[in-house]
Amino acid sequence: MIFTKKVKFHYYHEYNKNLFCITQMYNHIPGHGALTRKDLNVENVNNYIKRFSNKPHCFNNRTFFPRSYRLDNKTECDEFFIFINSQEYTKIKEKEAMPFITKVSYGSHRGHGLEILDAPHEKRLRRKFENGAMCGEIVDNIMAQRYISNPLLIDGHKFDFRIYMLVASTDPLIVYYHDGFLRLSLLKYDINSKEVEFFFKGET
C-alpha cells in the first residue's frame, strides 16, 4: 500500500498499468477532495443549486446545507460582509449568541482552526478585511459558516460516526465494510454552557 501527501499524484500516473505490483493498493480515490474539502463542498452545493434551480422536481432547497462564505473568494467575501452589515444579521444576533463560526477551508481537521464568531472575533475579522474592502486581496483559506445551534443529538450529546469500506473489485463488485463506530461528546450539549467552545471541536 502506498501513502502519499502529494495531492496531485494521480494527475500524472495511470493506475493498473504497471504502476503498482499486483498486491499493492493506493489509498486515495482520484478527485476525493471534491468530497473531503470544506471549500469544495460549498462550491459543489452552489453549483448544484444553480444547475437545478429551474427544475422543481429536483431537490433545490439549500436548507440542508448551512449558509457558507469562502472568504478567499471575492464574490462570497463581498456577500458575507454585506450580510453582516445588514439589519437581518443584527436581528439574528439579538436572538442567537453565536450565529456564525469560522473555519479553515482545507488542510485542517478535528476542529483545528475553528472559532466562534463572537464579538471580539468579528471585530478582528472586520479589521483584517477592512469591513469587506480587502475582499479579493486577502487569500487566507478561511470560510464563515452559519452555526447549527439545534443539532441532532444522541441522549443529549453531539456525535459523529465513522464507517469504513474497501472496494476489493469493481467487476464483479466486491465491497467489504465494517459496521462502524460512533463518537459521542463527553459533555451534554448546552448552547448556553460556559464550556460552549468544547462543543465546536471535533475531538470531543
Feature-to-residue mapping (PLM):
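Catalytic core of tubulin tyrosine ligase-like
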Residues: 72, 91-101, 105-204
